[in-house]
Amino acid sequence: MNALVGCTTSFDPGWEVDAFGAVSNLCQPMEADLYGCADPCWWPAQVADTLNTYPNWSAGADDVMQDWRKLQSVFPETKGSS
C-alpha cells in the first residue's frame, strides 16, 4: 500500500497494526517487519525525536531487585522556567 505523505512513499504503520488496520499478519515472521526500513524516508512512529538523559536517576538504587521502588518518574522542567 503506497500513499504520498511528505517525503515518504511507503505506508508502514509499525508493529501496532498491519497495512489494513489489523494485527493478524504481524510478526509472521518477525523479520518481515524489518523490510519497511528499506525505504529512504521511512521513520517509525515509535522512535523519539529527542533524547534526554538523567544520569542521577538511579542514584541510591544499586540493586534493581531490591531497590526498584526507589526509581521515580522523571518530569522535565518546562522551557523558560528555572
From Swiss-Prot:
The cysteine tryptophylquinone (CTQ) is generated by oxidation of the indole ring of a tryptophan residue to form tryptophylquinone, followed by covalent cross-linking with a cysteine residue. One of its GO terms (cellular component) is periplasmic space. The keyword Oxidoreductase applies. The active site is at residue 33. The keyword Oxidoreductase applies. Catalyzes the oxidative deamination of a wide range of primary aliphatic and aromatic amines. The physiological electron acceptor is the constitutive cytochrome c550. There is a cross-link at residues 27-33, 41-49 (3-cysteinyl-aspartic acid (Cys-Asp)). One of its GO terms (molecular function) is oxidoreductase activity, acting on the CH-NH2 group of donors. It is an enzyme of class 1 (oxidoreductase). It is found in: Periplasm. Its cofactor is cysteine tryptophylquinone residue. Its EC number is 1.4.2.-. Keywords: CTQ, Electron transport, Oxidoreductase, Periplasm, Thioether bond, Transport. There is a cross-link at residues 37-43 (4'-cysteinyl-tryptophylquinone (Cys-Trp)). It comes from Paracoccus denitrificans. It holds the Pfam family QH-AmDH_gamma. Belongs to the quinohemoprotein amine dehydrogenase subunit gamma family. It catalyses: 2 Fe(III)-[cytochrome c550] + an aliphatic amine + H2O = 2 Fe(II)-[cytochrome c550] + an aldehyde + NH4(+) + 2 H(+). Contains 1 cysteine tryptophylquinone per subunit. This is Quinohemoprotein amine dehydrogenase subunit gamma. The modification Tryptophylquinone is found at residue 43. Heterotrimer of an alpha, a beta and a gamma subunit. There is a cross-link at residues 7-16 (4-cysteinyl-glutamic acid (Cys-Glu)). Coiled coil: none annotated. NCBIfam families: QH_gamma.
